[in-house]
Amino acid sequence: MDWKLEGSAQKTESRVLQEHEITLDDPGEDGVSESFQLLQIDVGCEHWEQETLPTGSAAWCSKNVQRKQRHWEKIVAAKKSKRKQEKERRKANRVENSGIYPQHSKRFLRSLIKERLLEAKHSGPRLCIDLSMTNHMSKKELSRLAGQIRRLYGSNKKADRPFWIYLTGFTTDSPLYEECLRMNDGFSSYLLDRTEEDCFSLFPLETLVYLTPDSDHALENVDLNKVYILGGLVDESIQKKVTFQKAQEHSVKTARLPIQEYMVKCQNGKNYHSEILTINQVFDILSTYFETQNWPEALKKGVSSRKGYVLRNSVE
C-alpha cells in the first residue's frame, strides 16, 4: 500500500514537472513568436509609410531638405545652361574658322590658311616679337607668354589679311621654347620665322617701329614698309619703360596705340586705368585696323572696359 502511494506520488510529481517544463517552454516560444510578429508589424509599418509618403509634398519634408533640393536643382540647371552655351560657342567658332567657306573640308581650309600666311610672308605687314628679355622671367611668366603667343598665332590664322610673324631672340634650348612646345599643340609646325638673332640686327633700323605704351607718338597707320616690334615681356613686378628704353638704346622709332586719341577714362570700382596690353591684345588691334582701317573699331576689340577706357563716342 505504501509502495503504491509512493509510486503514485512519483508519477504525479513527474507529470507536474513535465507540465511545468512545458509551461516554461511555451512562454519562450510565444515570446519569440511575439517578437517576430512585432518585427513584421514594424516592417509592415515602414513599408506602409513608404507607400503612403506623398512624394514632393512639403508636409513630409523639412525646410532644410527643401532648401537643399532647390540648391541642387539650381546647380543642375546651371550646368545644363553652361553646356548649351559651350556647344553654341564651339558651333560659332567652327563657322568663324571656316570664314566664307563653310561648305569646304578642313583640309581645304588648312590649305587656304597656309596660302594666306605664305602670301603675307612676301607681301603682307610684318610683326616681330622681341623675345630677348625672357632670361629673368619666372616659369609662371614664361607660361603666360607662351599662351599669348598661341592666341596671337591663332588670331593671325583667322585673319583675312594676316601678318607675317617673326620670333626673334628665340633659342631652341631656352625655357620659353620648351614651354611653347608643352603648351601649344603643333608649335613646331607654326608658319612663322624663328631666329636667335635680335630684331635690331635682323632688319634695317630705319624700318623698325617699337610699339610701347610709353612712347610720345601715336601710331597713325600700319605701313607695309615697316616692321612693328612687340616686346615679349610678361613682368608681374611691372617694371616701367623697359621696352621704351631698349628702343632708345638702338635709336629705333617708337609708337603707342592711339588709345588716348580715341578713348577716354571711365569710372570703375577700383579707379584703375591702364594702357598696358598683352601681345595678343595689341595684335588683335593691329590686325583689325589693317583690315578695317578704323581705329575705334580696332581699339574696341582689343581694349576691354576692365582697363578703365571706353570709346569717346560711347560717352558723348
UniProtKB/Swiss-Prot annotation:
Alphabetically ordered keywords of this record: Coiled coil, Methyltransferase, S-adenosyl-L-methionine, Transferase
EC number, UniProt record: 2.1.1.221
One GO molecular-function entry: tRNA (guanosine(9)-N1)-methyltransferase activity
Protein's GO biological process: tRNA N1-guanine methylation
Family annotation (Gene3D superfamilies): 3.40.1280.30
Family the UniProt entry places it in: Belongs to the class IV-like SAM-binding methyltransferase superfamily. TRM10 family.
Name of the protein described by the UniProt record: tRNA methyltransferase 10 homolog B
Gene transcribed to yield this protein: TRMT10B
